């Protein structure tokens, strides 16, 4: 425990949206004069930002709260698990306070009650212009909205985070510019539903960076493309308006990367999920997009073992994967989530069947991925360096988002620094990662691409 300046620690779990919430809390605490630490021992109190989406995440959150109580004893809990009435208090009755996601004021109030705010004159220069970030200096998450209007039957996010509320586009662009000026090279735009950005405000036009900008995915992407840094739009729901950004990719204004979670490819399963179910239309769009943008990288996620899923329906999913030839794919076995409608739709798929289907799915996709990665050998690509150690540099290409996609290993990259852009030639590949060597003389460079991912 600290004896002088009041000190707060935080443990942030879950998705990038939760990371942004944690960063906002830390930024405000720093502005109020609190010292921040990642040590249980040094902290006067610890904030745990939880995830409550699936059972394993709930257990991880409860375990982390328990660890914080054991190591520190004064714990404030926030986040999605906090929105589930009584769950935390039942297991850990000694926590100081519990609040739901994005409950910034409640968390700050709890901190004030646990640790009196330091007496100081709150000068703005206590906090860096970009705020407190939990990510490396060269990339940052940018949250553009809160909540979701969809009611996918496997998901309980709307019950925890509410309906979609878009941030003003002028605020989003202003924050993005501050991040760029602080040295951020890559922005990862996050929300529950990026393609729906602005629907709640009827896509109204505001002035952002001195020019009229529509509050929409296209309007935001166009504005961010002027910043000269990489920008990835995550969680792009497969709306027709995704078509709008493809021509921008073809013109070289956006990076050719599209993250579009599809979840399944059998029409009846998609209907049960309350997801868009026109699989043929999806395949047509993918084909059309690749005709316009030949080097387009498409990332998606799928669920196997959804309640009632038959072998024939699973085979429809495999057939889709074979035909679509997606570049980046994540697969999850269906996990019952307390409060999810899907739990009561049909008989659950046995665990051993879910595992067997998962294995077959991944075997097929790994072969597709391996073929696509092998095709990159001998090509020169631009990468962004994430870290450098005794074995060389680790970077990502335009096709790779941090943590969820592959990496580019550069054994001869000891002279590079995190945040550098560099041209490399690929000399080896496996199912997910590349190995490359720098080409030509290294010169730090700007980039004017935006990534939709």
From Swiss-Prot:
Binds 2 [4Fe-4S] clusters. One cluster is coordinated with 3 cysteines and an exchangeable S-adenosyl-L-methionine. Its cofactor is [4Fe-4S] cluster. Residues 374-440 form the TRAM domain. It catalyses: L-aspartate(89)-[ribosomal protein uS12]-hydrogen + (sulfur carrier)-SH + AH2 + 2 S-adenosyl-L-methionine = 3-methylsulfanyl-L-aspartate(89)-[ribosomal protein uS12]-hydrogen + (sulfur carrier)-H + 5'-deoxyadenosine + L-methionine + A + S-adenosyl-L-homocysteine + 2 H(+). [4Fe-4S] cluster 2 binds at residues 148, 152, 155. SMART domains: Elp3. Residues 134-371 form the Radical SAM core domain. GO terms for molecular function: 4 iron, 4 sulfur cluster binding; aspartic acid methylthiotransferase activity; metal ion binding; protein methylthiotransferase activity. CDD domains: Radical_SAM. Residues 6-116 form the MTTase N-terminal domain. It is found in: Cytoplasm. Belongs to the methylthiotransferase family. RimO subfamily. This is Ribosomal protein uS12 methylthiotransferase RimO. The gene is rimO.
């Amino acid at each position: 425990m600290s004896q002088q300046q009041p000190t707060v620690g935080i443990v942030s779990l879950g998705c990038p949206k939760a990371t942004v919430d944690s960063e906002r809390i830390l930024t405000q605490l720093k502005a109020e004069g609190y010292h921040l630490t990642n040590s249980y021992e040094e902290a006067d109190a610890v904030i745990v930002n939880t995830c409550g989406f699936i059972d394993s995440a709930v257990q991880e959150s409860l375990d982390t709260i328990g660890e914080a109580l054991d190591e520190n004893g004064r714990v404030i809990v926030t986040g999605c698990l906090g929105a589930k009435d009584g769950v935390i208090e039942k297991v850990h009755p000694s926590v100081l306070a519990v609040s739901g996601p994005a409950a910034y004021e409640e968390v700050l109030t709890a901190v004030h009650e646990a640790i009196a705010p330091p007496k100081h004159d709150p000068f703005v220069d206590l906090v860096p212009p970009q705020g407190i970030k939990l990510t490396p200096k060269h990339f940052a998450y940018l949250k553009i909205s809160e909540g979701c209007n969809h009611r996918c039957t496997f998901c309980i996010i709307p019950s925890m985070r509410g309906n979609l509320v878009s941030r003003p586009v002028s605020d989003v662009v202003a924050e993005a510019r501050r991040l760029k000026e602080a040295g951020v090279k890559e922005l990862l735009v996050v929300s529950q539903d990026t393609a729906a950005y602005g629907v709640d405000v009827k896509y109204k036009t505001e002035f952002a960076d001195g020019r009229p900008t529509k509050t929409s995915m296209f309007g935001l992407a166009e504005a961010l493309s002027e910043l000269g840094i990489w920008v990835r739009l995550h969680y792009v729901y497969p709306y027709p308006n995704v078509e709008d950004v493809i021509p921008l990719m073809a013109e070289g204004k956006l990076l050719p990367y599209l993250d579009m979670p599809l979840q399944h490819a059998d029409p009846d399963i998609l209907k049960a999920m309350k997801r868009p179910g026109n699989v043929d239309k999806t395949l047509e769009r993918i084909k059309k997009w690749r005709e316009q943008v030949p080097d387009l990288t498409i990332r998606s996620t799928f669920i196997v073992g959804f309640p009632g899923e038959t072998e024939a329906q699973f085979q429809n999913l495999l057939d889709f994967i074979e035909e679509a030839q997606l570049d980046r794919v994540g697969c999850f076995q269906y996990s019952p989530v307390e409060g999810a409608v899907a739990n009561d739709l049909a008989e659950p798929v046995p665990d051993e069947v879910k595992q067997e289907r998962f294995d077959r799915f991944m075997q097929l996709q790994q072969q597709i991925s391996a073929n696509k990665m092998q095709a990159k050998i001998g090509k020169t690509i631009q990468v962004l360096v994430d870290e450098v150690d005794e074995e060389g540099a680790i970077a990502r290409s335009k096709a790779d988002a941090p943590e969820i996609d592959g990496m580019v290993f550069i054994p001869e990259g000891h002279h590079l620094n995190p945040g550098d852009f560099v041209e490399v030639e690929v000399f080896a590949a496996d199912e997910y990662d590349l190995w490359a060597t720098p080409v030509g003389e290294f010169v730090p460079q700007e980039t004017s691409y935006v990534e939709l991912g």
